[in-house]
Amino acid sequence: MQVHTLISSGNGPIILWVMYPHRGDELEHTADSIRELVGEEQFTLVAIQIDDWNRYLSPWRSDEVDGSFAGEAGRTLDYIEQQVVPQLDIQSQANRPLYIMGYSLAGLFALWAMYQTDIFAGCATCSGSMWYPGFVEYVNSQPTLANKRIYISLGGKESRTSDRLMATVADRTKEICDLLKKDNDVIYEINPGGHFADSGKRLAKAVKWIEKAKG
């Protein structure tokens, strides 16, 4: 795992972006997309690069997916809580809320993490893998989240796939949104295109929504 501070500000929310291994200038390109959409930088954005995506972001093993989904998300969350967050010195910045954000399987991880720890004021899940076996059932079985800010977005064409599990993503995402809306500040946004369309812009829209809170 590698950690990169992409945007740094002395005030506003601190956003942890859990991401896949970047390629070329991808980090800078995404940061530029965020700056272009958000404008004045009143937030800090920290990227946490996960090398083995399926292994370290899947919350549990399942017979319905291949063995690369090893269910070791807990190790990643431990690393974030024990190694990354202490370096941010959150306690000395008490009025700066901490958010976690991710795309695809990292989006699933971000929401799952909300049920594991209370350190986050909210999360953003962009094109999150809500199709993951057992996740809707997991959310239903957990104590209800309350007073959190949660941003969820999905591509309008993402469920148009021959993959049996992934084809359920729109229905499962909507079901999870409806559950969360009862006690939290939740926005659900549908974007044009499929899973990989304009990922940088989708993340930028999530950051803009988080940044608007100012606390």
Placement of each model-derived feature along the sequence:
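Active-site loop/turn elements of alpha/beta-hydrolase fold enzymes
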Residues: 48-52, 128, 193
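The conserved beta1-alpha1 loop
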Residues: 17-21, 127, 154
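Gly/Ala-rich beta-loop-alpha elbow adjacent to hydrolase catalytic centers
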Residues: 101-106, 110
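The feature captures the conserved acid-bearing segment of alpha/beta-hydrolase catalytic domains
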Residues: 130-210
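Serine-hydrolase catalytic machinery in alpha/beta-hydrolase-like enzymes
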Residues: 7-91
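Conserved hydrolase catalytic core segment
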Residues: 112-122
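A conserved amphipathic alpha-helix that caps or lines the catalytic cleft of carbohydrate-
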Residues: 34-35, 114, 177
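Short beta-strand immediately N-terminal to the catalytic nucleophile in serine-hydrolase-like folds
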Residues: 97-102, 126
